[in-house]
From Swiss-Prot:
The keyword GTP-binding applies. HAMAP family: GTPase_Obg. One of its GO terms (molecular function) is GTPase activity. InterPro entries: G_OBG (IPR031167), GTP-bd (IPR006073), GTP-bd_Obg/CgtA (IPR014100), GTP1-OBG_CS (IPR006074), GTP1_OBG_dom (IPR006169), GTP1_OBG_dom_sf (IPR036726), OBG_GTPase (IPR045086), P-loop_NTPase (IPR027417). This is GTPase Obg. The gene is obg. Residues 160-326 form the OBG-type G domain. Its main location: cytoplasm.
Length: 327
């Protein structure tokens, strides 16, 4: 499984350069005053959201990042150069947590958004600062400050307008494929989708992202299966679509499992549930259609039965999603 949605890295900002201890030595001033420049500032460590990144896989091989130190102060009152910042690219949707304090340092939700996670140390003062009427040749200087050093936990939460949530093997991946032309891995066994797949519905003037969330099972909110890993990806979605298999032995129970797991994970997410999509309409049991239609009315939800195999009602579902997003 190459999708990695949590990572731990160490970052070290650059140290500031020390102040210089130098004196002017010019042809006509053999005993010139102090002329040590200040040290340069250390480089900072910056995390930046990049839409071309979709996983933390890069951090499997490199977990320690060090920015450049500032240069020491130079003769003739020349300051040392500042150390270069190091910019680490992460997926859009990355939350950055300081492991030691548990503080959230930043939440990178837009492409190009950046956050300084470790500040470079200030440069030290050269001896030019320490001349006094009674000491014209000071050898005093100050050391550069140490750059910040941190251990960071990175958590990726998928950002999608709509998340398709369902039990394993209900046909979510196939539905995403026919809705968006995304190409998720599809096979006829549970847990084919081991990470969120994203697709895009494009209209004349807008586009909407849809995420196929890996199958949720009973007690997912307690971590059953990969429940907590999966459920966190629905938090940012504007709307949740519940996918229920119309050929299931007990579609009402399937619905109840999904609603319960979402509620127990975060009850505020329930208000995002707007729609039940009945999948596998081509092999549906008639009584299941009736049961889900009745259930949807009781819960004030919309019900749309579809077949990804035959394409029945797929265009209608696209229009429905477009209208939903436009309200």
């Amino acid at each position: 499984m190459n999708f990695i949605d949590i990572a731990q890295i160490k970052v070290k900002a650059g140290d500031g350069g020390n102040g210089g201890v130098y004196f002017l030595r010019e042809k006509y001033r053999p005993y010139g005053g102090p002329a040590g420049g200040d040290g340069g500032k250390g480089g900072s460590v910056i995390l930046q959201a990049d839409s071309s990144k979709t996983t933390f896989l890069d951090f499997k091989y490199k977990r320690h990042f060090v920015a450049q130190n500032g240069e020491h102060g130079k003769p003739k009152n020349q300051h040392g150069k500042n150390g270069k910042d190091i910019v680490i690219k992460v997926p859009v949707g990355t939350i950055v947590i300081d492991k030691k304090t548990n503080d959230v340092l930043c939440d990178l939700v837009k492409h190009g958004q950046s956050c300084v996670v470790a500040k470079g140390g200030d440069g030290g003062l050269g001896n030019a600062h320490f001349a006094t009427p009674t000491n014209q040749t000071p050898r005093k200087f100050t050391h550069g400050k140490k750059g910040e050093e941190k251990e960071l936990i990175l958590i990726l939460k998928t950002i999608a307008d709509i998340a398709i949530v369902g039990l394993p093997n209900v046909g979510k991946s196939t539905l995403l494929l026919v809705l968006t032309n995304a190409h998720p891995k599809i096979a006829d066994y549970p847990f084919t989708t081991l990470y969120p797949e994203l697709g895009v519905i494009k209209t004349d003037d807008k586009s909407f992202t849809i995420a196929d969330i890996p199958g949720i099972i009973e007690n997912a909110h307690k971590g059953a299966g990969l429940g907590l890993d999966f459920l966190k990806h629905i938090e940012r979605s504007k709307y949740l679509v519940l996918a229920i298999d119309l050929s299931s032995e007990n579609p009402v129970k399937d619905f109840e499992i999904l609603i319960t797991e979402i509620y127990l994970y975060d009850k505020s997410l329930i208000q995002k549930v707007k729609t039940i999509v009945g999948t596998k309409l081509d092999i549906a049991k008639k009584e299941n259609l009736e049961l889900l239609e009745k259930l949807a009315k009781e819960k004030s939800l919309d019900f749309i039965p579809v077949s990804s195999t035959t394409g029945q009602n797929i265009e209608y579902l696209k229009e429905y999603i477009t209208n939903l997003m436009n309200h």
